[in-house]
A protein has these predicted regions:
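Beta-strand repeat architectures
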Residues: 1-2, 19-29
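Outer-membrane translocation/initiation segment of Type V secreted surface proteins
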Residues: 2-4, 8, 31-222
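Short, T/G/N/S-enriched strand-turn elements that build extracellular solenoid repeat scaffolds
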Residues: 8-22
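Outer membrane beta-barrel translocator domains of Type V secretion systems
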Residues: 138-327, 454-465, 469
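Outer-envelope beta-barrel architecture signal
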Residues: 192-196, 233-241, 279-287, 332-338, ...
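Solvent-exposed, glycine/polar-rich loop segments of beta-barrel outer-membrane systems
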Residues: 212-217, 253-259, 295-314, 348-369, ...
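Outer membrane beta-barrel transmembrane domains
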Residues: 265-268, 362-474
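Solvent-exposed flexible segments
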Residues: 292, 343-347
Length: 474
């Protein structure tokens, strides 16, 4: 039975003939069409909708079809009727929406799902008929009684798993700049006692995880870095400052193909102190501050259609790094440099407020403290051509471990514009592991111009990296 009166369904003619085959009962299923044209959670069907079916029931009763089971076609709506006991006909029919919290089971054991469905329930009927959010709820209304898996999938899609490892993505974006600053300082020769180095770069990466609720992604980044160096009278002794920005786009491997854009800028200072006259043993300390502006376009599947929500947030950070390295010259062109380093970082991530879209979320502001020791070794090669250009190559491997709370931080979200409580987002389990990273770079240096290409791999997240850069020294 269609419940809206628009494009009404017709009763089955001569259904009472089934009694001749021994069938004495039948089901009458009431659809949810009326919910498309109403924001109410309680709907009474009109007499004009019921009457044709009463005629069908009366005619079938005369033929011996005497029992009728009447229920809703929808998992999330319940049909209730009052019947005339004498004639078995329907006097009144009502549709009542089942609260989404019912499908979260025991709220004490499924608190996160319960809190989300509580917010979802509060959003029902808020937006106007014909809006995209209303269309989303229509999709949920159409889920059938035996299609509970579709409802669970829709809940999971809408809960904002794209924000699950937001801390790691913010940190990895900053790491791109750190790596480029390192290239400027260590891989390119200094032209004079006071040098200015500028480099444009582009890079690509991929992150994979086995943690449930954390989504794989690829990223593409490009940007510019600048470094000013003041070298002292003693080889290796100097100070300087650096700055740069990176624009990093993450493309998630979820069903909707969500996308996040990060724009981060850094500015910092450093000081290098040699411990011998040929600068084979050197200690460098650096510190910087960062500012980020980020946008999320979260896309999610509900039944068979993609919906989306858009949010923005800012980041603010400060970091301090100490590195001690020792150079061993193996041949005229080849050197080996083992080193140890530790980086301390504090990052504040502002509240994410999704301003547009469907089932918008608020993600609670948070922060992380990173303590990351690293030990590694670089094998460097340098060859001077007859033209004066220099061919450089570097193969490096290092082990680093995160001792702070980056992925361990509790990220929480809630359905925006509701009084529902916060629910927890998944944590990246792989962050408990250390990371072995391997990098190879190849460059050509002229007196002023130069370029590099690099590739790398991280065991944590099975992260593949590749990039190119062009620089100017003056």
């Amino acid at each position: 039975m269609g419940s809206s009166g628009i494009n009404p369904t017709n009763p089955i003619a001569n259904i009472g003939a089934l009694a001749n085959s021994g069938i004495k009962s039948a089901d009458l299923i009431i659809g949810t069409e009326a919910a498309k044209y109403s924001n109410s959670k309680y709907i009474q069907l009109g007499k004009d909708i019921i009457e044709p079916y009463n005629k069908m029931i009366t005619a079938a009763l005369r033929r011996g079809l005497s029992k009728w089971e009447i229920y809703s076609s929808s998992l999330t709506w319940q049909a209730t009727i009052t019947k005339n006991k004498a004639t078995q006909t329907i006097e009144n029919a009502y549709m009542t929406k089942v609260p989404y919290t019912v499908f979260a089971a025991d709220k004490n054991t499924t608190r996160d799902t319960y809190n989300f469905t509580d917010g979802l329930e509060q959003r029902y009927g808020v937006e106007a008929i014909g809006s995209r959010e209303k269309e989303l709820f229509n999709k949920l209304n159409d889920i059938g009684n035996n299609e509970g898996i579709l409802l669970k999938q829709a809940f999971d899609e809408m809960m904002g798993h794209q924000y699950a490892n937001i801390h790691q993505r913010v940190q990895s974006t900053g790491n791109i700049l750190d790596k480029e600053f390192n290239y400027l300082k260590n891989d390119w020769s200094t032209a004079s006692k006071k040098s200015n180095k500028i480099k444009t770069f582009g890079s690509r990466g991929e992150y994979k995880t086995n943690t449930a609720g954390v989504i794989d992604y690829t990223n593409n980044a490009y940007g510019v870095v600048y470094m000013h160096e003041n070298e002292g009278l003693r080889l290796g002794k100097g100070t300087g400052w650096y700055t740069g920005f990176v624009y990093n786009t993450f493309k998630f491997k979820d069903i909707g193909k969500s996308k996040e854009e990060m724009l981060e800028a850094k500015v910092g200072i450093y000081k290098s102190i040699p411990f011998d006259y040929n600068n084979s043993l050197n200690w460098t300390v650096s510190g910087d501050i960062s500012l980020g502006y980020n946008k999320m376009n979260r896309k999610f599947l509900v039944v068979d259609e993609i919906f989306n929500a858009r949010g923005r947030y800012n980041t603010y950070g400060v970091a301090l790094k100490n590195e001690l390295g020792k150079d061993f010259r193996l041949t005229e062109n080849i050197s080996l440099r083992p080193y140890g380093a530790i980086k301390l970082e504090y990052m504040k991530i502002g509240k994410v407020k999704e301003k547009s879209g469907e089932i918008r979320l608020d993600v609670k502001d948070s922060h992380y403290i990173s303590v990351r020791p690293e030990v590694g070794v670089d094998l460097n090669y340098k060859y001077i051509l007859a033209s004066g250009k220099i061919i450089t190559a570097r193969l490096g491997t290092a082990y680093e471990d995160e001792l702070g709370k980056v992925a361990k931080a509790n990220n929480k979200a809630k359905v925006a514009h509701t009084s529902a409580d916060w629910f927890n987002l998944p944590k990246e389990k792989e962050d408990r592991k250390g990371n072995v990273k391997t990098d190879f770079s190849l460059g050509v240096e002229g007196e002023i111009l130069g370029g590099t290409a690099n590739i790398g791999y991280d065991t944590k997240g099975h992260n593949m990296r590749a990039g190119v850069g062009f620089r100017v020294i003056f």
